[in-house]
């Protein structure tokens, strides 16, 4: 079975999503109210940040279990509104390098109310991962730098370990969730799919599948959206248009959510498997160190600011030099 790499090149994706009858789709189960997945992604209703023990019922009104029993509800404000990246530094995001169709991201609130502000941030450097002796992982990964600091969200920390098998430990990592805005479908009890929406109209979210294979730098999650798993009652599978969409994991020992990886590929027609690139903290640290190099020249003990009336000035006799690459 061929594995597909999801490429959200927006113009091409729009044409494909509207003309092809066999394109792949985002997958959730039709047996529970679709609003669960919408609210989960927007931190609305029962799914406000920090909420726990959230009851889930099916469309018959029957209880099918409780979400977020072992972790507080995550705050999804770190995810871009198009769902293809997450904020991991004051002005850095993480996604996959084959996402060449986006030049910026938005962060902020949803809705048309004037108080629901959101702002766009242009990408000024893509920082695509390059494989060499000191960078041993797959190249389909990047940490773009934004034009300015993001003020609508605080960045989320990355997982510290690149060994994928680490994250199958349900005692230490009891919960995983994912979010995205790829083309939206539901699957019925007979495993037939039905279209709900095209891509990039809104985000949906839920718990991930369980971990299958793993190696250094990647993890594969597999399952069936019709069946709850150990993570919860709202499994969701990523698909076409979801490349770069983030997966998060709860570290019970540290008591906080971390970004675990970004979606790279899978079998979206069946909605049964997704492969993620593990978040690379060392790579981000390397990028930041290269972008910001500060040098102080201590020549005098005084610091006097003198304006020249022309929009510039001089500060004493020692300097501060940020280096921009």
Positions of PLM-derived features:
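Bacterial N-terminal signal peptides that target proteins for export
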Residues: 2-11
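N-terminal carbohydrate-binding/catalytic regions of secreted carbohydrate-active enzymes
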Residues: 55-90, 94-108
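Chymotrypsin/trypsin-fold serine protease catalytic domain
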Residues: 141, 145-241, 263-268
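Conserved catalytic-core segment of clan PA serine endopeptidases
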Residues: 31-38, 105-168
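Short conserved beta-strand and strand-loop elements enriched in small hydrophobics
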Residues: 101-117, 172-180, 249
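C-terminal subregion of chymotrypsin/trypsin-like serine protease catalytic domains
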Residues: 26-57, 83-99, 202-325
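Cleavable N-terminal signal peptides
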Residues: 12-13, 23-24
